[in-house]
Swiss-Prot record:
Residues making up the signal peptide according to the UniProt record: none
Subunit structure: Heterodimer of the IorA and IorB subunits.
Temperature effects on activity: Optimum temperature is 70 degrees Celsius.
Gene Ontology molecular function: indolepyruvate ferredoxin oxidoreductase activity
Cited function: Catalyzes the ferredoxin-dependent oxidative decarboxylation of arylpyruvates.
Listed EC numbers: 1.2.7.8
Keywords carried by this UniProt record: Oxidoreductase
Protein's name according to its UniProt entry: Indolepyruvate oxidoreductase subunit IorB
Pfam families found in the cross-reference section: POR (PF01558)
C-alpha cells in the first residue's frame, strides 16, 4: 500500500489529537511508515482542530494534501464540511452526529445545516460518502463520554479497504489508556464497530 490518508477534525476538548496518536502508533506497529501532523494553537476548548494521519510504504510529509484524504473522521458534523476539500473522490466522511454549534450560529448570524444537507454536499459536490451516527450516545452507553474518540476509531476500522485490523488498534488502546479504563474503552470500540457495520451493511 503506497499511502492511506486520514483527516481527523472536530473542536478542542474532544480527544482528536489522542485519536490521531492512537492511529499513528497502531500503523507504526503494523510496519508502516507513519506521519502524524496537527494544527497547533487551535486546540482550546471549542476551537476548530484538525489532525492528519498518513501511513503506508511511500509517505512523505505530515500534511494530507487537499483531495487526497481516504477518510475524514469528524467529531462534530459541521467541522467535516469545514475541511471537506481534503476528501478524495470516492472517500468517506464518518462523523459524530451530535453538533456543537459555532459562535456564529449561537449568535444567530448563521444557520446550522442539517445532516441531510451535509450528506448532499459531500455526495453531490465532492463525490464522497457521508455517514453520521451519535458516537457520544454510544460512548455514554460504554460508560464514559470521554471515549467518544474510541467509538469513532472503532467505526473507522470498518471502512472498506482500511489497512489496520481491529486487533492492531485494540492492542494500542490497551497499552495507551489508564489500566482502569481499558474495559470501558474496549466497550466503546466495539460499539463503534457495531454501528459502522450496521451503516455499511457489513
Amino acid at each position: 500500500m503506497k499511502e492511506y490518508n486520514i483527516v481527523i477534525t472536530g473542536v478542542g476538548g474532544q480527544g482528536i489529537l489522542t485519536a490521531a496518536n492512537l492511529l499513528g502508533w497502531a500503523a507504526l506497529r503494523a510496519g508502516y511508515k507513519v506521519r502524524v501532523g496537527e494544527v497547533h494553537g487551535m486546540s482550546q476548548r471549542f476551537g476548530s482542530v484538525i489532525a492528519y494521519v498518513r501511513f503506508g510504504e511511500d509517505v512523505y510529509g505530515a500534511m494530507v494534501p487537499e483531495g487526497k484524504a481516504d477518510v475524514i473522521l469528524s467529531f462534530e458534523p459541521v467541522e467535516a464540511l469545514r475541511y471537506i476539500n481534503y476528501l478524495k473522490k470516492g472517500g468517506l466522511v464518518f462523523t459524530n452526529a451530535r453538533p456543537i454549534p459555532p459562535v456564529q450560529v449561537s449568535m444567530g448570524l448563521a444557520t446550522y445545516p442539517t445532516l441531510d444537507e451535509m450528506k448532499k454536499i459531500v455526495e453531490e459536490d465532492f463525490g464522497g460518502k457521508f455517514m453520521a451516527f451519535d458516537a457520544e450516545k454510544l460512548a455514554m452507553e460504554a460508560g464514559n463520554i470521554v471515549t467518544t474518540n474510541v467509538v469513532l476509531i472503532g467505526a473507522l476500522s470498518q471502512t472498506p479497504g482500511f489497512p489496520l485490523s481491529e486487533e492492531q488498534i485494540k492492542e494500542v488502546i490497551r497499552i495507551s489508556v489508564p489500566p482502569k479504563t481499558i474495559d470501558v474503552n474496549m466497550r466503546a470500540f466495539e460499539l463503534g464497530v457495531k454501528a459502522a457495520k450496521e451503516m455499511l451493511g457489513l
